[in-house]
Amino acid sequence: MAAAAVDSAMEVVPALAEEAAPEVAGLSCLVNLPGEVLEYILCCGSLTAADIGRVSSTCRRLRELCQSSGKVWKEQFRVRWPSLMKHYSPTDYVNWLEEYKVRQKAGLEARKIVASFSKRFFSEHVPCNGFSDIENLEGPEIFFEDELVCILNMEGRKALTWKYYAKKILYYLRQQKILNNLKAFLQQPDDYESYLEGAVYIDQYCNPLSDISLKDIQAQIDSIVELVCKTLRGINSRHPSLAFKAGESSMIMEIELQSQVLDAMNYVLYDQLKFKGNRMDYYNALNLYMHQVLIRRTGIPISMSLLYLTIARQLGVPLEPVNFPSHFLLRWCQGAEGATLDIFDYIYIDAFGKGKQLTVKECEYLIGQHVTAALYGVVNVKKVLQRMVGNLLSLGKREGIDQSYQLLRDSLDLYLAMYPDQVQLLLLQARLYFHLGIWPEKSFCLVLKVLDILQHIQTLDPGQHGAVGYLVQHTLEHIERKKEEVGVEVKLRSDEKHRDVCYSIGLIMKHKRYGYNCVIYGWDPTCMMGHEWIRNMNVHSLPHGHHQPFYNVLVEDGSCRYAAQENLEYNVEPQEISHPDVGRYFSEFTGTHYIPNAELEIRYPEDLEFVYETVQNIYSAKKENIDE
């Protein structure tokens, strides 16, 4: 509506601007004010875009003040979408009225698509072609992203379904952009050694919703460099590194001067700023994200080494990365320039161990084994990133509690972007798609996504015929099942076969045995799992066995579980359930329960009334007891 009002107002500007202004009551007094005062009034923040459109149609002078490239429309744009202003240079010529219209249109289109996702993808993960509507929209991508961010920032407990799908779309858009940037980065010549830039791309890809930029991370590192320079000045006030300007890449050749830099670095990083290797929580993905390393001041050998190397190089010390087994190191050359060097001409630096300087023998003691000379060699950017992503991949294989395997999916994407012909990882990716049910909307797209991966594997390694054949068979079976699927199953509480169901979707529950908090998002009159699951979960040991209602619940730890009715009870102190899929099923949290979204309510049309009765009986009674 706002966009229509703006368009409507601006369409009449040329015709009305030629008419005499004094006919309008009080207008003559207004237009006689100095231009700066009028501009200040029009930019006061109380006027909407539609107001400005109407004002500019009253007379020529006000129209000129509201010119499309002027301050008035710039202020309208800034007030409405402040986060976008960083994308404009003060020296750029911008038609702010046109920008306003394009941004408004992009927002309306983005909301239309977000609103459609729940109905289209409620029963499955968003497929590979599910984002094509966004990709095909006309207009700057930053406008669509900004609208998605606006949706995510809506009032905390409402619009949960919109936020759920807006988050997925934003996640996808940013990851696609970051992956393209990473691929372009990997095409740089071998002598392009921006290790930090590559590490930031990995960080961004795994955390696409976070505000992470190379510029911001570099600024934080620059502030550390300033502290090192301050300490270095106390060691040697004439040190050449102190004269370096930002962005310079000069190197100092004297070993003694390099040593002074490293001493100052060790003091600032480990004594003053308290950076340290994270021995207590080593297997945490946060240790590999550079923005988290700077925030938490801890990491693992490879991330600590990249930070150390970046600072050292900015101060003129040419350290090099060493892909040492089990413990990433840096090496510092002690030999003369131009001489033939071997591994004993280097000192090896353990950034994880507070910058400790090691000999070759001490490096072997560090990992408890003898290694060949080749493992002391320097590695390029791609190999460093391969090791970082390999670490994330290992962590991703361990994690699965939220059943989305997001870290595993992200690290697989990154690894295959660098090494697209890794057969075992391609097989793992195909299995992951199959396991998660991330099926495309149409069978032809599924063939392009899953079967294409399998065909590529077969070409690379014919020996994988058995594994590929198994996955192809199951993929084709899935296509056939999708063709045979019937409509939505509706469960009515009033149905006689559901008479034993005591709880309803949206209620906050507590598990009697394990104590976890959860919200119900589905139920069955009896256990619908297979015999193997029933046996493994020891369901027969329950007093009512599998002949009782079972509930699908989202648990606060991020897992999804299937709980027997006798194991659940009302949570007398209901709280929000921080599960990533809450928005998939619910539109709002009221403080006592969740309200199902339209798609879930279609499947359980009588549950909401029962929820209201339960809330009234359980929580209102509790409040009355407290008041008494």
UniProtKB/Swiss-Prot annotation:
GO terms for biological process: apoptotic process; cytokine-mediated signaling pathway; ERK1 and ERK2 cascade; hematopoietic stem cell differentiation; hematopoietic stem cell homeostasis; ubiquitin-dependent protein catabolic process. One of its GO terms (cellular component) is ubiquitin ligase complex. Gene3D superfamilies: 1.20.1280.50, Hemimethylated DNA-binding domain (2.30.30.390). Residues 28-84 form the F-box domain. Keywords: Ubl conjugation pathway. One of its GO terms (molecular function) is ubiquitin-protein transferase activity. Substrate-recognition component of the SCF (SKP1-CUL1-F-box protein)-type E3 ubiquitin ligase complex. SUPFAM superfamilies: F-box domain (SSF81383), YccV-like (SSF141255). It comes from Homo sapiens. Directly interacts with SKP1 and CUL1. It comes from the Eukaryota. InterPro entries: F-box-like_dom_sf (IPR036047), F-box_dom (IPR001810), Hemimethylated_DNA-bd_dom (IPR011722), Hemimethylated_DNA-bd_sf (IPR036623), SirB1_N (IPR032698). This is F-box only protein 21. Pfam families: F-box-like (PF12937), Transglut_core2 (PF13369), YccV-like (PF08755). PANTHER family: F-BOX ONLY PROTEIN 21, SI:DKEY-261L7.2. The keyword Lipid biosynthesis does not apply. The keyword Zinc does not apply.
